Every structure is written in C-alpha cells, then in structure tokens.
Amino acid sequence: MANQVSTDLFGNPIDPVVGYARGSILRGTDEEVVRMLRARQMVGERVRSKGKESVFDLSGMNRGAGIGADEVPHLTSHVPFFERFEGRTEPYALRHMGADPTRHKALIINRVSAANFIALTTLLARGHHVYALAPAGGSTHPSAIRPITMVGATFTQFHSVDELERAWRERGAPRLLLITPISASKRHIELADVRRALALPRDSSTLAYVDDAHMASRVGYFREPRTFELGAVDLAVCSADKHVAGPRAGVFVGRADLVTQIGSRVYELGLEAQAGQYVGVANALRNFDPEVIRQAGLLAEQLLVVLQSKYGSKAYLGGPGVSIVGDDALEIAQGRAAKGKTTLVAVEAAGIVAMEMLAEDGILTIGAVSMPSSAPVVRLMMYPDGHRLGVQRIAASLDKALNKLGRVLDDLDTAREILLGPAAHRGATQSIAVEPATALSAR
C-alpha cells in the first residue's frame, strides 16, 4: 500500500489534502488566490499595452467562450436558448467520452471540480472506503480528496496497480475505485494498468469513477481510448478546456440512474453549466481535433531534448508538454546560485518561475493562473501557442526564470513581490475568506 509522503525533498511538512508543503509566502488558499488574480492582471496589462499577440499561451487550456457570432442572438434570453440549444450538448458529451447513449447519460457542469464534489458527496457516506489509483509521482486531485474527506469516507491512495490489487484482495472491494489517469503534474498511468484496475472483482455496491480531466491528452497524444472504452466505468468527468477549445466546464457522463440521482443535486446547488457555457461546450466537443494535440506533443518531445541537456531527468515529458517539479526547480536554482538551504517551498518556486516567464517574456503557463491547490510544478504545455514561440525561445525564457529564482532564494521580500505584487511586503495582500477544510480546488 502506498503511504502519503509526510515531507518534501527539503524536509518541509506536506499538507495531505493538497499534496505539497505550504510556504511562508503562499501559506494557503488566500495567498494562492492573490497570486492567480495578479497573473490575470499582468496578462490584461500586457495585452492593453502590447497587443494580444504579445502573450504566448503555454497553459494547455483555452477557456474562451467558444461561441460563434451567429449564436449570440439566440442567447439574449432563455426563451430562444431553449428553442435553439436545449438538449443538444449532451449527445456530443456522450460521443466525446465514448459512452453508450442507451445506458449512459450526460450533464454539463460548471467545473470539473464541481463534478467531483457533487458526485462524491452524493455517492459516499461516513465509513465508506475509497481506493484511489494515481500515477507514480502524481496524486489524486484535491478537488476529489476534499469531498471524500468532507463526508467522512476513508481515502487510500495507491501509485501502482500491484499495490491496489493486493489491498483489494486482502481487504475486499471498496465502495469506490477512483482513477486519475493523468495527474495535475502531468504524470500518466499506463493504459494496461488502468484496464487492470477496472477489471478487479467488485461487490454489488462498488463503483468505478474516472477523473479523466486530461482525457483529450490521453486520446490525442497517448492515442488511448476514450473514457468509457477503457473498461467497466460507472461515472467519469473530463474537461471542456484542457487541450480542448472550449470554456471551463466539466463534461460529466455515467450510468443513467447515477447521473439522474447526482443531477438532482447539481440543480439544487446551482452547479449546472449556464447558457453560454453550455453552447460553448457543444462547439468544443463537436470540433475536437486530436491531431492538434499530437502536433503539440511532437513539439514537446523536441523541447524535452533541449531541456534535458540542461537539467537532466528533472525535466520530464508530461504528455504534450514538459514539466519540472517545484522541488527540482529549487535544486536547479540552488546549484546555479551556489546557495544553501532556502525557506522557499516547491509551490513558491514553481510560481516564481511562472510569474517571471509571464512578466519578462509574456509566456503564460499554468503555474501563473492556476487555481489554489494546483500541483507545484513548472508546466510548459505546447498547446496552443508552442509553435508560435519555438523551442529555443521557450528554453531561454525558462532558463532566465530559473536564474531569477536562484537570486531570490534568500530574499523573501522580492520573492513575495514577484508572487503577490508590490504591495505584498507591506501587508496589503488581498484577503479571501475561504475555510481551508472545505475549500475546493477548481479546475
């Protein structure tokens, strides 16, 4: 059985919910929200002063409206919306995820995290056991861990199918098998292992839930089957914006009886996609092109060669992108700066690199605009703008940002200003009231 690691590479205690160490700058959700909002403002200011083309999006996400001009007149109120669009997105969702319309049903939910929250809090109760299979080097997303904890269920995470199978055999089948084929850190479970996990013998009450937020990467880059073609899946969610040209939304599909049950709570709590979002998702799923992702992956493979020549195995292929975990970014920076122990932690290091690449070169990565609890990893996704930049410019920008990280390893005031803005060292950071025990990391 895989136990949670209690400290990071530098001995800092890991928060078991988010899976990384909290720092003295990014202490929790409040500060991570400030960093995210600052990055959004930086993008806006750059576009206003230098134009939209001055920003190079390496986030792997689109998050535009996905709506055509001809559709806008039908979104002026719910009356024309119902006539033109109601019920037309769900068939695309079923097809996109490889589901069977005679057995499955779809819902469009406002976020992947909202889908995780509502599904898991509906299906689980105190005393239930959840076995989670996550990639080696990765983790189940906090937006799934939090609702499991909230209802009092027991969460056990495994990083190999052998360990999962051993626990299954010794302890019996759980209430829920939760599989994350690709983690937020862009680690990937081999297809054969996913299929093996889904084939484990189940009790009548055992359900299989796949948090397939990155399904588009699996299909486009890894050439794997769509979610419901993997095996006996009861419920699953994928993203409408991760390597898909749609708005931020969760495409939630599953057994018709379960989706009906969960759907009632979706409407109770106002988690359903709204009109414009609903239409944008339909367009994104209808026009989904795996070849675009494959081309991004080929560029990522070229970038990997360049970065591994500088950083060795610390740079790894994260599907159609290249990643360096925050702890490794700290080690690289320490080596260059010839400095000893730092008080910065991985999430701060990854954030500083991301904010520097944005400020200096207009390169927008997940680490700058990610929601709280996103994995502390430098992620360079080649979709959508990697080809516009080219490998050498991306590598040069990363190198400069790592040098900057090295210079601020022992300068907390400057590090804080990079992450939170010039007012941060004066104690003027924005305060967002979020209870840490219940805050949901949104995707």
Model segments located where?
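Short, surface-exposed, charged loop/turn segments at secondary-structure junctions
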Residues: V79, V251-G254, A338
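Conserved PLP-enzyme active-site core in the AAT-like
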Residues: S6-V17, R88, Y92-I293, L304-Y311, ...
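N-terminal glycine-rich, Lys/His-bearing helix-loop that initiates the first secondary-structure elements
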Residues: M1-N62, Q308, G319, A415-R443
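Conserved C-terminal alpha-helix-loop-beta "cap" of PLP-dependent enzymes
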Residues: A2-E32, Y316-E417
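Conserved N-terminal alpha-helix of the aminotransferase class I/II PLP-enzyme fold
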Residues: L26, E32-I118, P142-P147
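Short, mixed-charge, low-aromatic patches
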Residues: R40-K52, D70-T76, M215-Y221, D234-S239, ...
